[in-house]
Amino acid sequence: AISPQSFLIVNSRGEYIQQNFVSIQEAINEAENGSTVNVPSNTYFERIIVNKTISLVGEDAVTTIIDGGLGGTVVDVVADNVTIVGFTIQNSGWGWDRSGIETQGADNCRIENNILFHTCHNIRLNGSRNCFVAGNKIDHVNQMGYGIRLTESTNCTVSNNFVAQNIGGIVFENSSNCTVVGNNVTRNSDGIRLYSSSSNNRITANIVYNNSYCGMIYPLQYGYPEDNTIFHNSFINNTNPFIIQSGGNIWDDGYPSGGNYWSYYNGTDFFKGPFQNETGRDGIGDTYYAVNYFEADRYPLMNPYGSIRNLDTNLTYLTIQSAIDSSETINGHTLRVGSGVYHENVNVYKSLTLMGENQATTIIDSDEIGTVLSVNADNVSVVGFAIQNSGSLFPTYGDDCGVFINHSTGCKLSDCFVTNNRIGIYLFFSQNNIVERNIVSSNRENGMLLWYSGNNVLRHNEISNNSYNLGVFGGSFSDFNNTIDVGNTVDGKPVQYLIGVENEIFENRTNIGVLYLINCINVTVRNLNLTRNGHGVFCFNVTNSKIENVTALESSYGIYLQDSSGNIVYNNVCLKNWVGICLQDSDYNIVEGNIVGDGEKGISLYEADNNNLEGNTILYSLYGIRLYSSHSNEIFHNNLIENAIQADLIASYSNVWDNGLEGNYWSNGANSDANKDGLGDLPQTIDDYNHDRYPLLSIFKKFRVDYEGRIYNVKIISNSTILSFAYENNSYIIRLTINGPNQTYGFCRICVPHTLMEPEISVLIDDGLTEILYSNYSVYDDGFSRWIYFTYQHSTHEIVIVSEFWPVISLSILIIATFLLAMLRKLK
């Protein structure tokens, strides 16, 4: 027994009576019909009979406990118009006549917001009418007995209860015209059972999942349930979705309302309409779901019912697009989307918030058709989705993306997975947007692309394993004036997006994934390795800067200069890019000594004038050099090797293809060398107006020599492979090791600065043991350098180049040493 507790009884006249009782039954006995008995928190070890029209209200469902002590039904209701609310009811003991709460022939009763466990029939309506069972939590623990059982009852409602771990979750037996709606039924043997002739019941909007035997069952031996309407339920991961041995029930609410969601349904949604033969998606499967041999769900849902809800109107929808299209959905509303796979193309043209339940499990999949999610309004927020499988077409920009933000401002895209699209996230002429905490991976073109879109904020996005991870394109500073911090990464390396930097050096940094320089002066970029981006290095309005020894691979553009002047792009390797090096609206730059190729364009100039392209090797591209509306550029000493179109000019004039002495090497050039100087006898025709007057007959190479603190260049044109080059400062000797195929002839055309060697020059091959077939040591001299030319038969050779005015004693020693060495070799 417990000590007396203070109960508050409010009678039908509104009078408050505070009185002490040692049991709930004592308080019931004292109360008048129509009273409300408020029960204070405690554990009451008793079984009670409610035989009056009263409301029995517990102070707190967790702490107001009625324990039946395993002796039988805990709360027995035998009067009409009784309310039981706010209790924990437990320990009825086992037996088919034992319940947690039972109404016996009692009508118009309400059982709400109670907790029941360790009872056989947790809640049982027995021969009752017009009762309401809602908001109760039933968790039996050991899967014994029934959760909620309706026996020979009519016009009752069972709503929004949680029912778990029973033999049967919700059970009908000879009951009719009842409504079961919005319940959560899980981890039972059977989710919902219909026995005997239970008919004309409405079972809707329940979630029935993870039940070990089946979602619903109609056992034949107990009669034939008929004319029940069952729709908008979600049957998820039950061992058997449904077991039935009769027919005559209705499994959908017609079109377009739809039927039920079946997790085992494997149909598709490409069509709509009552006959599912009209083009378009509607969230309903295109084929029926066979419930049994006799019955079918004609309009199975593609996602659990209620997954898409307008939080402002509380309306539910079958597709995200139908929620957006609804006239009840207006600017400022929030649409919440539950976990599931939504096969649709979403167009957000209202100022809405789309909120996914979980970014890993709330999936919008367009089945490789078109753009997955398009934003065509301002002030749209999209958060918490996986967005995947756009189409793969390459039409006008804007089609076939994961997320396409089109001419929109004030939008936010956050906490999304964006994968396996043509373009992951695409901002198109869109400003003042925030893109943050997204994981963008495995997209077939760009991971994240900004096209003429400025004043956007990108924060903490992980961009990886896309063909081109990040690309920012535009035409003016306003397009590039974005805030993109180092919290963004490409393939695990930080993005460096810098505006207004001066006198900075970026050298040997392994933690740079991509480098954007906007409005910068006197910046040096050196020894970086950059791959798979829209640009490796991008410069907008950058002056007096230098980019050297950068390796930029597999990007849309390796190195890109836009509206930039007075820069040097030197000795970089740009391979397997769409364009190796591009100059757009950029003048008076030097592009020298770079290796570019294996792409569509090696070097591209677009409206770029007065630039110098020298000593670059451009190979294996569709276009070696391409000029569009670019004028007065100097292009020489470049090696154009096996490009499909070596040079292509569109509306470009006054460009010079040689320096007045030497031009470029063209691997497809057919030419002769009658005067033996390493240059073709005939000009190389580029088009009717452009010619290389002095085409090189083989590859051009330049070797830098550091002499007394200054850099001098030794320039070599040779059809031999140069294995090594050395200049000996103390002896003024140049040494080369070369080779070439046996039984062929090689040549060298070499330009030697006078500072490194007196203009009168001699050449020895293999210490004089290999014959020089032809020589001309005074091909040309401009007062600063001497050009020489000589030929030989190919093998592996050491070539020594010396000045004829080398100190006489030194020359004599060299000749004697060479003679003695030759004699010794003969003696051997």
Locations of regions flagged by a protein language model:
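Acidic Gly/Asp/Thr-rich repetitive segments characteristic of extracellular carbohydrate-active
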Residues: 7-49, 306-343, 347
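Right-handed parallel beta-helix/beta-spiral solenoid domain characteristic of secreted/periplasmic
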Residues: 54-97, 315, 351-401, 490-512, ...
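Consensus "Asn ladder" position of solenoid repeat domains
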Residues: 87, 114, 136, 161, ...
